[in-house]
Amino acid sequence: KTGSADFLLEAGADIAHDRSLLKSIFEQTGFIFLFAPLHHSSMRYVMPARQKIGKKTIFNLLGPHTNPCSARKQLIGVYKRSLVETFSSVAKELEMEHVIVVHGNDGLDEISITDDSFISELKDGKIKNYHVSPKDFGLSYGNFESIKASSPQESFEKVSLAFAGREGSVQDMIAINSAAALKLSGIVKSMKDGVELSKSAMNEGLAQSKLESYVKMSNNL
């Protein structure tokens, strides 16, 4: 019911920027958010039909592979276990550099904290499939209700607490997925190291500071 765009809007960010402004925001903050309807010019024409259908369609699968930045490295979450290896195979055909495709056994299109997760990782032209659990990273299994957000406001409140250093399932969920992105970027060698770095960033206020600088910059251009 609530996604990344909803969260950023609730945080006070302006996400309706063209490419030139996005470049400036990225250069000054190291972060940007690309609101799909503004950057997939062809996709905007099918949005009304998708909303009327009310179910997942082929367009849910096309999005990650039509990244407007032509990203060579990507973390992709999929909503069905059967799609994980399909996505990594497509990434290989597209000759992408490093891609991590994830699916939680509880049905989440993310690495889950409430259950084990399946991952298909493409790197240097080779695909490796494996399972991970929260325990692999020194974390405990969480409760699904504790990470669920039924509104943008609830999502913002939960993330704000995690960014303020409150440990628990929400912070763990953020850390375990951030870890995959940190591994992709080459900042850490393992996801376990990524979890530790991500938690430190939240507990030391760095994540909150980054969010605030992005929100401020997005409104000043």
Identify the meaning behind each predicted range.
Residues 1-2, 7-10:
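Short, structured segments at the rim of ligand-binding sites
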Residues 9-16, 21-221:
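Glycine-rich anion-binding loops and their surrounding alpha/beta cores
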